[in-house]
Amino acid sequence: MKWVVIDTVIQPTCGISFSAIWGDMKMIIWYQSTIFLPPGSIFTPVKPGIILKDKEYPITIYNIAPFNKNLWSLLKSSQECPPGESEITNKCLHKSCIIKICPYGLK
């Protein structure tokens, strides 16, 4: 089964991400990974992780739940990344970010 990413929220201090996805139904996944799942990406879940662009990546999925608009709004409002000031300076202001390559292109 292929899943399509609608939107992703990253918490850079702990490496946890949440993605709104579409599979058989709209869902929210809570996971930890070294990769970023940008909106529009299509992946297939497999036992050790996911297959994205014909390559397998490890991913730890903590929970999958039916999409809930209120929960997604709460997650989006608590999003730490990217901070608004970074758009002006092109620099990440998070000193404790554990993500090695910024998905937003910040330095």
Swiss-Prot record:
One GO cellular component term noted in the UniProt record for this chain: cytoplasm
Superkingdom of origin organism: Bacteria
Presence of keyword Cell inner membrane: no
Residue ranges the record marks as coiled coil: none
Single GO biological process annotation from the record: cellular response to starvation
Signal peptide interval: none
Location(s), subcellular: Cytoplasm
Keywords: Cytoplasm, Stress response
Database matches in NCBIfam families: PRK09919.1
Function according to Swiss-Prot or TrEMBL: Inhibits RpoS proteolysis by regulating RssB activity, thereby increasing the stability of the sigma stress factor RpoS during magnesium starvation.
Annotated HAMAP family: Anti_adapt_IraM (MF_01199)
Family: Belongs to the IraM/RssC family.
Protein name: Anti-adapter protein IraM
Species this protein is from: Shigella dysenteriae serotype 1 (strain Sd197)
Gene: iraM
